[in-house]
Amino acid sequence: MSAIFNFQSLLTVILLLICTCAYIRSLTPSLLDKNKTGFLGIFWKCARIGERKSPYVAFCCIVMALTILFSE
């Protein structure tokens, strides 16, 4: 099933996007900072969420990992 129609898969994709953008911004900040608006601004916003809400994002990643491991 597609990640759009499955809520758990959609949350997993969003969490991975946030974590990946925050990691890329920590390595090369200029790559995401030049695109703050428009379609590519989504990646900058995800990086900001990952930086500012990092304890919450980490907790959500742990919960999601446990859910994926122990579901079914």
From Swiss-Prot:
Q: Which residues lie on this side of the membrane: Extracellular?
A: 27-53
Enumerate the UniProt keywords alphabetically.
Answer: Glycoprotein, Golgi apparatus, Membrane, Signal, Transmembrane, Transmembrane helix
Name the source's superkingdom.
Eukaryota
Q: Which residues lie on this side of the membrane: Cytoplasmic?
A: 72
Q: Is Lyase among the key words of this record?
A: no
Choose one Gene Ontology CC annotation of this protein and give it.
Golgi membrane
Q: Where in the cell is it found?
A: Golgi apparatus membrane
Q: How does it sit in the membrane?
A: Single-pass type I membrane protein
Which Cys residues form disulphide pairs? none
Q: Does the keyword Secreted apply?
A: no
User: What is any one GO biological process for this UniProt entry?
Assistant: protein secretion
Can you tell me where the transmembrane regions are? 54-71
Residues with an annotated glycan are 35
| Cleaved signal peptide residues | 1-26
> Could you tell me which PANTHER family the record lists for this protein?
PROTEIN KISH-A (PTHR13229)
State the protein's purpose.
Answer: Involved in the early part of the secretory pathway.
Q: Tell me its family.
A: Belongs to the KISH family.
Protein's UniProt name: Protein kish-A
What organism is the protein native to?
Danio rerio (Zebrafish)
